[in-house]
Structures are given as structure tokens and as C-alpha cells.
């Protein structure tokens, strides 16, 4: 046995040496033919092209960029872009590729962050960080530009080995989320092409058309020039200056307020609503921390987290124009207008409070917003997050944490979210209670990015202490005559459609939309101020995608506590005797540890609410009462009745909502349906969402064992929902009845 292992090891070592030798020989050949590889060669050629009149800029903007955006960006835009090659901007293409994976959940030590536009700013710096070019960086001539370019070789490989005509891809194609990756340099490409002939670009998708391919190859042959962007307009610059002026006022009150605003908006795309032209994409901005004040070029403080120590005496909050292609899976649009700025003025400037000194950036302070921002009014903090509640939750749903099965199996596939009324959530009594619980509400990010998973026990104890203290506080409040009522749920002040949200999980990604969409779900959350704050600081501000296994596991396990807390808040509105019964239905087959935690800590609030029920279907009746309470702020999106289908066809298509059980479980996570109308040239779009049922969502692994297939169902909505469609159905309106009938017959 030992000899067998030794022989296998020898074979492996020999193979590695052969491949390394081949790459070395290839490099020598390339050096001989086209000179040494040096990113300054491309930089010099780009400067020369930029300084001389040329049609290259127009060619890129009019012909090349649209192809890249339509055929390349869909895979090459996010942290999980293959080989870290981001093609959503010229800077990403110039940066090149890297063999390391960003999503590497079992790493023992935190990795070095490699964030575009932040951790390095030019190709030379990226080469020092292990990135290699995909464009030619040797002699700049037409032959070298194609023969020494990984991108050109990838495109040619696809043309030589196009996608098979089979309806389903075979085992040669792996599109799973945790697939292995091969990231060849130009020196390694020959061996790569021999071993993976069908791995050209676009991978696992149809090849480029002849015109598209020729356009990109011509561009690469001519030097792959990508022009500098025009500066923003004077009108945009004035709006930027005004907002930066507001955020960088000198008072301590405003310095702390700006820090709070930044730490909640650093993942969003801000835009000035009043400056958006009809039918045009807004100019978006990232809010960043800079070493330099207004009027000087931005010098980004490239910290792992938004609350890490900046190592400067004064932080400036600046607006950096977004220059990458906008993609839905990371896009969090955040409109800035006079109405919003007036509210910020009211909450953070006009309110009566006094910041004595700026809080520390030490992890045990900065990672806990209830400590770091204790000097800001609770009402200001809660109102700020509620005003754009979808965006607040979207930071989790569209951020880097929300990717992969293990990251998402902490939530149910479909649930509704409500919020506690601000006047209730920010009362002086509650404020004093939050102050007393600051230590119990500490978050895993204080352990930074190389953490030990065993620390979970410490956080579990603190969460248990907090829940017990909270229920004691609530019991005392109810005994004092302050019973829960429907009015304790925020109604959006009668005009804000962020008052209720629907969250859909699509196995390894998720969506959050405004309003109560779909049939009444199995579970729901009611979120108060400390819960909303901790969701953000656990999953957005405090999460480091480059963190080690312990950090990522702690984050996932702590999220169990927050889910349980939100669900317990909802249960508190039900009659006391029904709470345990409903909760048990949500956590069937739960492990003994969870059962002990829930029964010993979560369900100790046993005071009656002030709500009178008229049926025994308490949960459904509560949903109805909440819906009535929020009816004036329900958005009109996603309603089938608002489509342009005929009345009969609306009713027919809505029959899909009745699919359930095993028939529903066979469907893809997201099905996009395009219906060609009988009386219009503009098609109608619908999305069919599969909701997978579970006995409980508390198991980190072995999710399949917790699946409750017989209770799977679907939600049909009008319009597009989700970022990762699995299948597209193209149907004529006259054939809707046939489509529905076929869907109802699905058995395997």
C-alpha cells in the first residue's frame, strides 16, 4: 500500500514538473518572439494612442464595449468571476486574472483583499499581487497582440470548438457554483487547450457570432485600446460637491453622523434623482473613505471593513463615480433627493444631542454599532435604516456574504418582513435597555478576519442572556399595561412602501422586494432597531469575503440567532398558547441543541398581546390584519392583474400558483416566462419562483435531509425577479392554456 502511494506521488510530481517545464519553455519562446512581458509596454502604447487623433476610442465605445457587456460581463463582474477576471470595466480587463478563488470558505488564514478600484490602482501594482495579464504586455504589434493574449486565445478556442448542439450540456461542462477552476497564463495556454478544448469563452454558452468575434479580434490585434472616460458634468459635480460638503462638516455631531451614514451605504450605488434624464441610466457613485478633502483627487482608505481603523487624523467621505457596467446581482440603487436630505438634516443635524468625542476604531467598539454610535439618537439611526429598508436588507441579499448554499440555508425560501413602529422601538425605556445590553449584543466581526469557530459558544451565551433580559423587559412592560398591538407595526408613515418586504431564497442566492408578495408564507420576521442594526453589521459591514473559515462560520452561525429573534418578535403578536405550537411547526426535526435553546430562552415571553382574534387560524388571521394595516403602502409591482394579458389568460396563467408538492419541487429555482401578446408587439414578462420547503433551516450541512418536498410551492409574479434565471419559457398568449396544462402534468 505504501509503495502504491509513493508511486502515485512520484507520478504527480513528474506531471507537475513536466507542466512547469512546458510553461517555462513556452515563456522562453514568447520572450524570443515578442520580448519580455512588462505592463509598461501596454501603458506606453495606450498613452501614445490617447495623445494622437484616432478612431480607436469610437471603435471601442460603439463596437467593442457593447459586445463585452452583452456576452462577457454576465460571468465576469463579481467576486466569483472566473479567475477573478472582471470584464465590467477597462480597469478590470487591464488588471487581468488570478488563480486564487475569492470564495474559499475553508481557508485557515484570512486572504489578502484584491478589490478593484481599491487595493491597487494600476496593472503594475496588480502584477505584484499575483494577477497576470489577459492582454498582450510584450512588444506592441498586431501579431504579438493576438499571439500573446490569453483573451484572444480563449475566443479562438471557442470558435474552434463551439458549443455542442445538444439540448443539455454534458459532463464536459461544469457550471456548479463550487466548480474547480483552471486559469491558464499565456505560457500555459497550449496545454490548457489540449486538455480542455471546450473551455473557450464564453464558457458553456453559445460562441460569439462571426461579426462579434471578428470585432473583438480586430480590437485585440490593434492593441485593445480602452479610452479614458469623460469627466462628470458640471451639474453632477455641483451635486457631488454639495453632498460631500454636508457629509464633511466639521462638528463632531456631523463627523459621527457621516461615519454612520457611510458604514450603512458603502455597498450602495448613490445617484441624484433630480438629475436623471428620461430613459437614461443615472450616473452612480460609491461612497468611500478618503484621506483627501473635497476638491482634491480621492485617495481611498482601503480597509477590509468600513469601520476599520483609517490611520489618519481625519476621514473624508467622498463620492467616487461608478465606472463599471451595472449588473443586477450587485446593484443597490440609492436615490438622493431633496426630500431625503431634508430628513437627514432633521435626524442628524437639527436633533438635540451632543457628541462629546469620536468613538474608537478598535474592533470591540467599531464592530458593535450599539457602542460605536451610542451618542447618536436611536430615532435617527432607526429612521435612517427604515427610510430605505429594502436597501438595508439588500446589503445582505446582494452583498458578497449572500452566495452559496451554506450562506443561504440559514433563511427560509419565502418569508415576509415587518418592522416595529419607530416611536415604540426608540422610546426612552427601550433606549435605556439597549444601553444595558451593549455587551450581550457584540458581533463576530470584533474577532476580525482570522477567527476561531469555537468562539461561537461565547456568542451563544451572550445571545441567550440578551433574549432572557429582553423577555423580562417585555414582560414588565406588558404587566404595566403596554400590550402589543397592530399599531406597533410600522405602516411606513402612510407613504413609504418599504414598510413590508418579501424575501425569496433561490438555493444559493436570494432576492428582496417591497411589499407582501405571494401566498402567506410559513414564517415571518418582525424587526426592531437592534435586530436591523445587527443584521447589517453581521452580514454587510462586518463580513469579510476574504476572511478565514472561522470568521465565515461564526457569521453563518450567529445569523441563526438573528433569524430566531425576528421570528420570535412575530410570534409575540399571537396568543400565548399558540406561539410554541407555531414555532414547533417551523422547526420540525430540529436537533437537541436548538430545541434546548428555543425552549429555554426564546419562548419565555408568555404575556398576551392586545390583539383580539376571531378564528383559530391565528397566524393567517395575523397576516390578514398586518396586510390591512399596511394596505396603503403596498406597491403595485409584481401583480398579475396589472399585465396586459386578456382577463381569461391572466386567470389561466395564475393557475401556476397552485403547483405544489413534488410537482413544484421538480421546477427550477427561477423560470422567466416571456409571453408574446395577441394585441401588442411588446411582450409581457413573468417570473415563476420555486419555494423549497424545509422541516427546519437550522442545519449548517446536509440540507437535503431537511427538505420537506411535499410542501414545496411556487410564486408567480409579473415582471422580472431574481438575478440568476435558470430557464426561459417563450410562449404565445394563445398557447398559455397549453403551457399551464403541461406544467401541471410535470411528474419527473
Which sequence ranges carry the predicted segments?
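Bacterial N-terminal signal peptides that target proteins for export
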Residues: 2-13
Amino acid at each position: 500500500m505504501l509503495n502504491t502511494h509513493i508511486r502515485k506521488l512520484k507520478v504527480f510530481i513528474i506531471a507537475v514538473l513536466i507542466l512547469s517545464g512546458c510553461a517555462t519553455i513556452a515563456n522562453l519562446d514568447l520572450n524570443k518572439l515578442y520580448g519580455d512581458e512588462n505592463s509598461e509596454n501596454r501603458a506606453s502604447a495606450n498613452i501614445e494612442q490617447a495623445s494622437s487623433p484616432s478612431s480607436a476610442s469610437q471603435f471601442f465605445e460603439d463596437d467593442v464595449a457593447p459586445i463585452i457587456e452583452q456576452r462577457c460581463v454576465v460571468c465576469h463582474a463579481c467576486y466569483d468571476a472566473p479567475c477573478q477576471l472582471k470584464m465590467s470595466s477597462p480597469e478590470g480587463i487591464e488588471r487581468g486574472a488570478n488563480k486564487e478563488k475569492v470564495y474559499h470558505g475553508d481557508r485557515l488564514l484570512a486572504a489578502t483583499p484584491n478589490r478593484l478600484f481599491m487595493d491597487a490602482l494600476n496593472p503594475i501594482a496588480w502584477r505584484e499581487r499575483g494577477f497576470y495579464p489577459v492582454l498582450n504586455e510584450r512588444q506592441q504589434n498586431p501579431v504579438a497582440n493576438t499571439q500573446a493574449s490569453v483573451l484572444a486565445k480563449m475566443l479562438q478556442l471557442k470558435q474552434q470548438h463551439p458549443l455542442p448542439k445538444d439540448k443539455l450540456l454534458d459532463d464536459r461542462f461544469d457550471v456548479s457554483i463550487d466548480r474547480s477552476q483552471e486559469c491558464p497564463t499565456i505560457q500555459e495556454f497550449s496545454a490548457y487547450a489540449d486538455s480542455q478544448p471546450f473551455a473557450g469563452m464564453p464558457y458553456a454558452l453559445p460562441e460569439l457570432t462571426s461579426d462579434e468575434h471578428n470585432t473583438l479580434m480586430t480590437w485585440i490585434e490593434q492593441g485593445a485600446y480602452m479610452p479614458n472616460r469623460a469627466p462628470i458634468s458640471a451639474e453632477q459635480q455641483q451635486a457631488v460637491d454639495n453632498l460631500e460638503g454636508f457629509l464633511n462638516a466639521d462638528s463632531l455631531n456631523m463627523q459621527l453622523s457621516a461615519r454612520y451614514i457611510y458604514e450603512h451605504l458603502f455597498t450602495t450605488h448613490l445617484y441624484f434623482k433630480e438629475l436623471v434624464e428620461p430613459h437614461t441610466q443615472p450616473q452612480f457613485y460609491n461612497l468611500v473613505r478618503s484621506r483627501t478633502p473635497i476638491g482634491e483627487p480621492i485617495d481611498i482608505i482601503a480597509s477590509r471593513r468600513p469601520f476599520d481603523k483609517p490611520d489618519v487624523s481625519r476621514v473624508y467621505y467622498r463620492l467616487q463615480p461608478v465606472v463599471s457596467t451595472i449588473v443586477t446581482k450587485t446593484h443597490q440603487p440609492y436615490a438622493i433627493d431633496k426630500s431625503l436630505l431634508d430628513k437627514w438634516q432633521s435626524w442628524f443635524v437639527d436633533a438635540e444631542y451632543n457628541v462629546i468625542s469620536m468613538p474608537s476604531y478598535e474592533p470591540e467598539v467599531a464592530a458593535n454599532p450599539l457602542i460605536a454610535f451610542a451618542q447618536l439618537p436611536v430615532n435617527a439611526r432607526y429612521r435612517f435604516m427604515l427610510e430605505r429598508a429594502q436597501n438595508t436588507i439588500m446589503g445582505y441579499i446582494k452583498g458578497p456574504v449572500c452566495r452559496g448554499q451554506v450562506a443561504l440555508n440559514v433563511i427560509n425560501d419565502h418569508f415576509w418582513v415587518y418592522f416595529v413602529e419607530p416611536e415604540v422601538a426608540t422610546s426612552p425605556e427601550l433606549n435605556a435597555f439597549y444601553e444595558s445590553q451593549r455587551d450581550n449584543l457584540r458581533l463576530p466581526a470584533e474577532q476580525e478576519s482570522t477567527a476561531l469557530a469555537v468562539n461561537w459558544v461565547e456568542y451563544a451565551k451572550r445571545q441567550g442572556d440578551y433574549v432572557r433580559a429582553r423577555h423580562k423587559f417585555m414582560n414588565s412592560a406588558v404587566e404595566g399595561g403596554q400590550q402589543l398591538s397592530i399599531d406597533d407595526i410600522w405602516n411606513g408613515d402612510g407613504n413609504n412602501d418599504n414598510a413590508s418586504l418579501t424575501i425569496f431564497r433561490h438555493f444559493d442566492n436570494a432576492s428582496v422586494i417591497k411589499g407582501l408578495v405571494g401566498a402567506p408564507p410559513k414564517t415571518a420576521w418582525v424587526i426592531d432597531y437592534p435586530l436591523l442594526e445587527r443584521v447589517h453589521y453581521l452580514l454587510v459591514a462586518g463580513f469579510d469575503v476574504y476572511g478565514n473559515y472561522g470568521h465565515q462560520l461564526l457569521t453563518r452561525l450567529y445569523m441563526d440567532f438573528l433569524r430566531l429573534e425576528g421570528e420570535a418578535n412575530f410570534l409575540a403578536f399571537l396568543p400565548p398558547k399558540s406561539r410554541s405550537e407555531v414555532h414547533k411547526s417551523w422547526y420540525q426535526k430540529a436537533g437537541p441543541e436548538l430545541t434546548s435553546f428555543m425552549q429555554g430562552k426564546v419562548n419565555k415571553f408568555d404575556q398576551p398581546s392586545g390583539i383580539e382574534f376571531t378564528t383559530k387560524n391565528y397566524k393567517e388571521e395575523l397576516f390578514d390584519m398586518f396586510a390591512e394595516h399596511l394596505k396603503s403602502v403596498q406597491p403595485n409591482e409584481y401583480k398579475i392583474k396589472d399585465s396586459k394579458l386578456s382577463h381569461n389568460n391572466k386567470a389561466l396563467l395564475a393557475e401556476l400558483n397552485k403547483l405544489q408538492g413534488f410537482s413544484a419541487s421538480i421546477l427550477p429555482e427561477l423560470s422567466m416566462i416571456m409571453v408574446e401578446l395577441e394585441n401588442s408587439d411588446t411582450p409581457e414578462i413573468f417570473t415563476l419562483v420555486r419555494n423549497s420547503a424545509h422541516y427546519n433551516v437550522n442545519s449548517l450541512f446536509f440540507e437535503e435531509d431537511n427538505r420537506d418536498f411535499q410542501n414545496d410551492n411556487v410564486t408567480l409574479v409579473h415582471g422580472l425577479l431574481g438575478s440568476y434565471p435558470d430557464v426561459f419559457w417563450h410562449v404565445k398568449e394563445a398557447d398559455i392554456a397549453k403551457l399551464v396544462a403541461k406544467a401541471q402534468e410535470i411528474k419527473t
